[in-house]
A protein has these predicted regions:
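Extended, low-hydrophobicity, polar/charged segments
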Residues: 2-216, 220
Length: 225
């Protein structure tokens, strides 16, 4: 339960058209539809010194929302490669929940090299999803003819099509909600604000009642915790 306040430590989103509100880490999103395009032939292109989405798109003269951004994490289950649209950000809480891991830390260059990729040029094409967990945001799976890393220094692919050119381990909503995104309840636009947490609900089951030896009668007058 949140109260909007400029001094709040948490960031929340709320819909301007309905009563939907959520912490940004928990806010759900539906995949954004992309304009239909005929699939083009995948090409590998040289992209020297282009390790960021902004640099790659400027060099290739492509809109950022036609690119795919990669973020790599290490976990107790091994390497996790996450892919979202170029103008989106990865929501780590959603990745943890999707993959069923306890925690994430940024992957090292050594771990990336062992998986057959390199920082700044990571992409889903050619990655063995039996050795590496590949998580692709649902919006990416609806895109066509996108640009992504070619998993080697100084190269990217263009005209990559999800499903045809790569198969992920998981397809899920893993992106961080942004101001102006469509509300998951009514389709209206969401806005952002700071908030203070004034209450929270936990599923504690019998954790405390068992410790306190508390019992209550059942409908049949049986004693149970």
């Amino acid at each position: 339960f949140m109260v909007i306040a400029d001094s709040g430590e948490a960031e929340i989103v709320f819909c301007t058209s309905c009563d939907y509100a959520a912490n940004v880490e928990k806010a759900e999103l539906f995949p954004l539809e992309a304009q239909e395009e005929a699939m083009l032939t995948k090409e590998e292109v040289v992209t020297p010194d282009c390790k960021t989405i902004a640099d790659v798109c400027a060099y290739l003269k492509l809109p950022v929302d036609h690119s795919v951004k990669a973020v790599a994490y290490n976990s107790e289950k091994g390497l996790i490669l996450c892919f979202v649209r170029g103008d989106h950000e990865v929501n780590e809480i959603k990745v943890i929940n999707t993959c069923g891991v306890i925690d994430l830390e940024m992957a090292t260059e050594e771990q990336l090299a062992a998986a057959g990729t390199v920082g700044g040029y990571m992409g889903p094409v050619g990655i063995d999803n039996k050795k590496v967990i590949v998580v692709v945001d649902a919006t990416v799976m609806k895109m066509h003819n996108v640009c992504c890393g070619a998993n080697k220094e100084g190269y990217h692919f263009i005209n990559v099509n999800p499903g045809r050119d790569f198969t992920p381990t998981y397809v899920a909503d893993i992106r961080l909600i942004q101001e102006g995104d469509p509300c998951p309840h009514c389709g209206g636009e969401v806005s952002k604000a700071r908030g203070i947490e004034v209450g929270q609900v936990f599923k504690l089951f019998t954790k405390y009642s068992s410790c306190l030896l508390y019992t209550s009668p059942s409908p049949r007058d049986m004693r149970r915790s």
